[in-house]
Amino acid sequence: MDVEAKCPMGGGKVEGRAVLFEMTNRLWWPNHLDLSVLHQNPPAGNPMGEGFNYAAEFESLDLAAVKQDIFALMTESQDWWPADYGHYGPLFIRMAWHAAGTYRIGDGRGGAGAGTQRFAPLNSWPDNANLDKARLLLWPIKEKYGRKLSWGDLLILAGNCALESMGFKTAGFAGGRVDIWEPENDIFWGPEREWLGDERYSSDRDLAHPLAAVQMGLIYVNPEGPNGKPDPMAAAHDIRETFGRMAMNDEETVALIAGGHTFGKCHGAAEPSQYVGAEPEGAGIERQGLGWDNSFGSGRGVHTITSGLEGAWTKNPIQWDNGYFENLFEYEWELTKSPAGAHQWTPKNPEAASTVPDAHDPHKRHAPMMATTDLAMRADPAYEKISRRFYDNPDQLAHAFAEAWYKLTHRDMGPYARLLGPEVPSEPRIWQDPVPASDHPLIDDADIAELKAQILAAGLSIARLVTTAWASASTFRGTDKRGGANGARIRLVPQKDWAVNEPTELATALAKLEAIQQDFNAGQTGGKQVSLADLIVLGGCAAVEQAAKKAGHDITVPFTPGRTDASPDQTDVESFAPLEPKIDGFRNYVGEKSVYSAEEMLVDRAHLLTLSAPEMTVLVGGLRVLGANYGGSKLGVFTERPETLTNDFFVNLLKTSTSMKWEASPDADVFEASDRATGEKKWAGTRVDLIFGSNSQLRALSEAYATADAQQTFVDAFVAAWTKVMNLDRFDLPR
C-alpha cells in the first residue's frame, strides 16, 4: 500500500518505517489555547463502565488475604528478575515511594492517587528505571483481585507490606485510589526536552513554580548532588526545597531518607550508556511494555544497572534497624565512583570493607555506600541535628518515619472521609485538613427558606453574597481534593487575608452572616444548628435565585446542609498558603504576573475545579453579570442590568464582532470596544473575557448560550455548574 497516496491522514517515516500521523491544530498553532485538559479520562475510555463503584468493590475485599499474597510473593525470587537478598521488599518500597513522590503541594498534582506510574511519562522517567519489573511482579496479585483492587492502591499497599515484612510497623493504609485509563496531560513536569535537563532554574537556583523535582525525569533530587556535583551542602539546599514543595518539613525529610535507605541497594554494575536500552515507551513492541533492556552480563541480578550508584547503605538491607545512622555517623566518608562512573561515597575505615552482604552471592561481602544526598544529612546543620537525635533515639525515628511514610503515600487522597479499609488510622492528621463531625440536627426546608430571607435582608448585595460563596468553595482542587467550602476556613488565617478575597469586604460579609448564624442557633431548643460554612454557601445560592428572579426565572438552587466549621487548631496555615489564587479568571483577578497567559491560567483553575469547557464558560458568563469581579471591576461585565442572571455576557460579546472594534489599552491585558461608526467606547474586558469570542471552541460554546432561545438553557447550566462547585468537597454526599 502506498501510505502517502491512500491514507487520508497522510504518511511519514520513522526510522525507515511507514507510520500514520496527523498535523494537529496544536502543531499548526502552538499558542492555541488547549482545552483538552478539561476533558481527560472521559467515561467512554473507562473499561469499568459509568456505573462502576470502586469504593464498594474495595470495601468487599479481604485486605488481610491480599496482604498475605503480597508477603508470599516478595520472597519468591523469579529467575527473570532475581530479588536482591531474596526479597522484593526494597524494590516495592522504591516503587511505592516513586508513585507517591511525584506529588507537589503547589498545585496538588502528581501522587499515587490514580495509578499513573503505569503510563507515560512516569513509566519511562530515568528515576523510575526498572520499576516496570516491580509492577510486572505484582501482576499476579492484580490479576487475582481485579476490579476490587486498583493499581493505585496496589502500588502503595505493596510498599506498606514490604515495610511490614522487614520488621517495620507502619501507621496505617487507606484504599480508595481510583485508576485512570490514560496519561494525565494537565501536569507540567518541566520545560526540558531531554531527560535530566534542568532548565527549570533561574538565577540563584530558583526553581520554577509549581515544580518540585530538580531535573526532568527525577522524582526528587540528583543523588550525586546538584547536576552531578558531589557537594553535600549544595545537595542539602536542593533536598530542602524539593521535599518542602512536596509538603515535607525537615524532620519528615530526614525520616523519609533514613527510613527508605535502611532497605535495599543501588544498582550501577556498569556504564548505562553502553549497555542499557530504551525506556518502556521507546522500546520495541516485542518488549511488551518493559524497558531498559540491559546487555551487560546477564542484565539482571549482579549485573543490574539502574541509578548508576552501586551498593547498600546498611549491614542488613532487608531488616528495619538503625543501621543507616550508625554507618553515617560512625564512619568517615570519602568520595569515590561506582563501576558505572557515578559519584558516591565509601568509608575510609578499613573495618567497614566487608560489613555488607552481597545481594546475590553469599560468598561476597562489601563496604556500605552513601550518596551525596545521604552525606547532606550530616553536613547540613539542621539535618545533622535531627539525624543525631534519631540515631540516639531509634524509637523517635520509627515514629517519624511511620508518620512521614503515611503522609507521603496518602497526601494526595484528600480528607479523612475519603479513606477506605480496616487499616485507616483512628484519627485524621492535620495535613488532611480535618473538619468536625456534624453532631446536631440539620436545618430543614423551612429553616432554609427563613435563613435565605434573613440573608437577603441583611444589607449584602447579590454580588457580595455570590463572591463570598465563590471565594469559599472555589479553593477546591480536584488534584489532591483539598480546599472547598466545608470548614468555613475562609474566615481563618490565611484565607481571610488573601488579596483575592478582598479582606475588608469579606470581613463585613462574614460578620453579617455570623450574626444570622448566632441568632438562629440561639433560638433553637432541640439542638438544631447551622454552620457558618453552610450559611456562606446558602447566601450565594439565595443571591443566585434572586438574580434569576430579576431576569424572570423562578428557580431553586439546590442546597444540602451538613458542612461544619473548622477551628484554627485544625488548620495548618503554612499548608493552606499554596491554595491562594494569585490569578483567578473567574473573578477577573490578576494578583501577580505569570509566564502563562490569563486565559491559560483560567483553564488551569477550571481543571482544578474539575470543570468541563461548557461549565467553565457558563460560570464565567454568569459570574460577570452577577458582578462577582474582584474589586467590583466592570471589566467583562457586558450588561446594562448587573446582578441579574442573564446571558448578556455572551450576547453582547458576540455582537461586538460586527458593531464594535476591540483595541488593546495601555495595559496590554485589557481591551476596549468602541462603536465602529462613532468611536464611542462601550465595553472593556480582559484577555479572559475576550477569549470566549476569539477561541473557536469557546466561541462555539458562547454562541450556544447567546441565542434568542438560550436564556433558560443558560440559567439551568449556570445553576448546575454553580451547585457542582459548591459541593466539590462534600465527600459525605452520594456521588
Curated annotation (Swiss-Prot):
| Pfam family of the protein (one) | peroxidase
Keyword Oxidoreductase assigned: yes
Complexes and interactors: Homodimer or homotetramer.
Q: Which GO annotations describe the biological process of this protein?
A: cellular response to hydrogen peroxide; hydrogen peroxide catabolic process
Q: How is the cofactor bound?
A: Binds 1 heme b (iron(II)-protoporphyrin IX) group per dimer.
What does the record give as the reaction this protein catalyses?
H2O2 + AH2 = A + 2 H2O; 2 H2O2 = O2 + 2 H2O
Residue(s) at site: Transition state stabilizer: 94
Q: What is this protein called?
A: Catalase-peroxidase
Which Enzyme Commission number(s) are on file for it? Answer: 1.11.1.21
Q: What function does the entry list?
A: Bifunctional enzyme with both catalase and broad-spectrum peroxidase activity.
